[in-house]
Amino acid sequence: MKKTTLLNSEISRVTSQMGHTDGLTISDAGPPIPQESERIDLALKEGVPAFMETLETVLSELQVEAVVLTTETREVSPQTYHKIVDLLKQYNPDIQITEIDHESFKKEVSNTKAVVRTGECTPFSNIILKSGVVF
């Protein structure tokens, strides 16, 4: 059995296959997931698993150099936005954070390796993680 925090085999597979700058989306419970994107559905019920819990677990496994958030996250769900930024800075103080509007974000999702759907129901709890290198 794996000793690291992340036990989900699908997420582990995707993160292990990611190269530099490849993207992984973590979303709330209601995202439109493009047909061409791999869907990793973790949602069990409202709030389970939580977005922040899922993000923290993935960050423990994946080297992330940049992220994409929506301006709507900051405007509509500011508490969540600040929790996300604080957590990201714990893992990488130099992380690059880009904000784009939600419609542009949905288009960008189709360029990521997979979409991890959580049970989160806080509006605009979505992020694209861009893989970094460990050297």
Curated annotation (Swiss-Prot):
Pfam families: RbsD_FucU. Its EC number is 5.4.99.62. It is an enzyme of class 5 (isomerase). It comes from the Bacteria. Pathway: Carbohydrate metabolism; D-ribose degradation; D-ribose 5-phosphate from beta-D-ribopyranose: step 1/2. The lineage of its organism: Bacteria, Bacillati, Bacillota, Clostridia, Natranaerobiales. Catalyzes the interconversion of beta-pyran and beta-furan forms of D-ribose. Substrate binds at D28, H102, F124, S125, N126. It is found in: Cytoplasm. It catalyses: beta-D-ribopyranose = beta-D-ribofuranose. The active site is at H20. Keywords: Carbohydrate metabolism, Cytoplasm, Isomerase. One of its GO terms (biological process) is D-ribose catabolic process. Belongs to the RbsD / FucU family. RbsD subfamily. The gene is rbsD. The keyword Acyltransferase does not apply. GO terms for cellular component: cytosol. GO terms for molecular function: D-ribose pyranase activity; intramolecular lyase activity; monosaccharide binding. SUPFAM superfamilies: RbsD-like. It comes from Natranaerobius thermophilus (strain ATCC BAA-1301 / DSM 18059 / JW/NM-WN-LF). This is D-ribose pyranase. Homodecamer.
